[in-house]
């Protein structure tokens, strides 16, 4: 399978686990950043999950129902398909705001029947996902 051009790639970065987490999306046709969020205390998997949901919600809002979303996170793709963030991050005063965002994302998934394909970015074949923060 080849990379679809009419697509966005999402990725998250987190310094520590948990730690300052951020995520973004890049348009594969133009290379432009579609959105960026963070940093906020969290985990990489949460960032990957929120990045996909953010991309889906933006596509929905803009009527882009066929745009493909690529993520290199198998866990996040699975969580989105199950419409639930399965994080083990402890809910504390420091993570409360993040948990509110997670709950909003889960609610969005449960109330919207999105059609966008969500595909695994094949890093081994295609190199780093274009939305990568380049901090490894």
Feature locations, PLM:
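Acidic helix/loop or adjacent segment enriched in Glu/Asp that either coordinates divalent metal
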Residues: 8, 33-71
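RNase H-like nuclease fold core
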Residues: 1-46
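Short intrinsically disordered terminal tails
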Residues: 1, 135-136
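Surface-exposed beta-strand edges and their flanking turn/coil or helix-capping segments
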Residues: 21-23, 38, 48-50, 82, ...
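RNase H catalytic domain
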Residues: 15-17, 57-135
């Amino acid at each position: 399978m080849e990379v679809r051009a009419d697509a966005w790639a999402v990725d998250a970065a987190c310094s520590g686990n948990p730690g300052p987490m951020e995520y973004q999306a890049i348009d594969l046709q133009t290379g432009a950043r579609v959105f960026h969020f963070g940093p906020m205390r969290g985990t990489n998997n949460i960032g990957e999950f929120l990045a996909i949901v953010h991309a889906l919600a933006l596509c929905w809002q803009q009527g882009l129902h066929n745009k493909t979303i690529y993520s290199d996170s198998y866990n996040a793709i699975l969580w989105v398909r199950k419409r639930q963030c399965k994080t083990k991050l402890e809910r504390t005063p420091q993570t409360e705001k993040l948990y509110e965002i997670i709950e909003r994302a889960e609610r969005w998934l449960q109330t919207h029947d999105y059609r966008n394909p969500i595909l695994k970015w094949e890093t081994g074949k295609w190199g780093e996902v274009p939305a990568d923060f380049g901090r490894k």
